[in-house]
From Swiss-Prot:
Listed pathway(s): Alkaloid biosynthesis; morphine biosynthesis
Protein's UniProt name: NADPH-dependent codeinone reductase 1-1
Catalytic activity line of the entry: codeine + NADP(+) = codeinone + NADPH + H(+); neopine + NADP(+) = neopinone + NADPH + H(+); morphine + NADP(+) = morphinone + NADPH + H(+); neomorphine + NADP(+) = neomorphinone + NADPH + H(+)
Cellular component GO terms held in the UniProt record: cytosol
Subcellular location: Cytoplasm, Cytosol
Amino acid sequence: MESNGVPMITLSSGIRMPALGMGTAETMVKGTEREKLAFLKAIEVGYRHFDTAAAYQSEECLGEAIAEALQLGLIKSRDELFITSKLWCADAHADLVLPALQNSLRNLKLDYLDLYLIHHPVSLKPGKFVNEIPKDHILPMDYKSVWAAMEECQTLGFTRAIGVCNFSCKRLQELMETANSPPVVNQVEMSPTLHQKNLREYCKANNIMITAHSVLGAVGAAWGTNAVMHSKVLHQIAVARGKSVAQVSMRWVYQQGASLVVKSFNEARMKENLKIFDWELTAEDMEKISEIPQSRTSSAAFLLSPTGPFKTEEEFWDEKD
């Protein structure tokens, strides 16, 4: 366990990852001094795992915060941090993977990533990131060649580990049929209102660590919901345990054997979110949470197309829960 109280998880490749990370997807203060200062404050209060992506456009601010943290002595070396970034869909082509990773490293001012993830199981026509994706730009991903390029990035030392995001059991199976090295992480939405039972069981059987995002319902995001934070069940448990609803939700995810990333730019909540590892939910608590109605928060609508690989949400997520 780290000095900040966050347990370390050993991934199937052997590298160790903090069980809790700070998410960096933010629209309101993207690319601002406030964003950089929030990352710097997170390092100061004890966060050592940061989750970014080319699409978040937060890599440069995070890189500046890391450089400043080193200068201020908040950390002694870059090796104290675990940095994750993600390959955007327009770069999910065999010849573009390495250049995309190298661009992320330039943004972050780093020599290597700890974890590099494919952001979605879809490719787009090559080009700059755009908020509104033309439907005819959505393409099926060549899992074999793209994953081989991800493996090459790891072999070259630009990332210590590789994985995926938002992959269903079916997509994972397709990828692993030709992979030399299986993904070590699958980052997906998971919370008390989306248990992901089938996917969790599949990933566990294949030594893939689930990293949960939208653990608190992605409140504030365009697709966000108050279903988690306003849950009466979670509120009752929180009162009984002397914890916050956020802490109960995060603790539930951790007790399912998953790692997680959460985001807050508020210092008090940053500190609160770290305090989920020295207590447990009871069997009765877990039973109550198991009965919470289930619904997905995140949407794949922007990656659906009549001519693309996925035409409906159900097809994209391959949901059986």
